Structure formats: structure tokens, C-alpha cells
From Swiss-Prot:
One Pfam family this sequence matches: Ycf9
Keywords: Chloroplast, Membrane, Photosynthesis, Photosystem II, Plastid, Reaction center, Thylakoid, Transmembrane, Transmembrane helix
Membrane topology recorded in Swiss-Prot or TrEMBL: Multi-pass membrane protein
Major localization class: plastid
Gene this protein is translated from: psbZ
Keyword Hydrolase appears in the UniProt entry: no
UniProt xrefs under Gene3D superfamilies: Photosystem II PsbZ, reaction centre
Protein's name in the database: Photosystem II reaction center protein Z
Length: 62
């Protein structure tokens, strides 16, 4: 169970780092938002899911 928690936290950190870089780039590009809207929403949905997963796994471990 601890390994699953650590992997979920690692995935959350990686996803956060990717979104931290990619979202401002998408907004700064001239046609970025209209062409990459689905990618931003998918990344955000993945991030929210990982936040809930880490919370659930944390409550099971401690």
C-alpha cells in the first residue's frame, strides 16, 4: 500500500510540474487555447483525480 501511495504522490508531482509549464505556454501562444483546450482539460482532470487518490491512500495508510 505504501508503494501505491508513493507512486501516486510521484505522479501528482510530475503532473503538477507539467501543468505548471504547459498551461502558461498554451495561454501565451496566439492560437494555443483554442487548439489545446482538450489537452489542458485532460491534464487538469488527471490532476484532480490524483489529488483525490492521494487523499484516499493517505487516509488508508495513516
Amino acid at each position: 500500500m505504501t508503494i501505491a501511495f508513493q507512486l501516486a504522490v510521484f505522479a501528482l508531482i510530475v503532473t503538477s510540474s507539467i501543468l505548471l509549464i504547459s498551461v502558461p505556454v498554451v495561454f501565451a501562444s496566439p492560437d494555443g487555447w483554442s487548439s489545446n483546450k482538450n489537452v489542458v482539460f485532460s491534464g487538469t482532470s488527471l490532476w484532480i483525480g490524483l489529488v483525490f487518490l492521494v487523499g484516499i491512500l493517505n487516509s488508508l495508510i495513516s
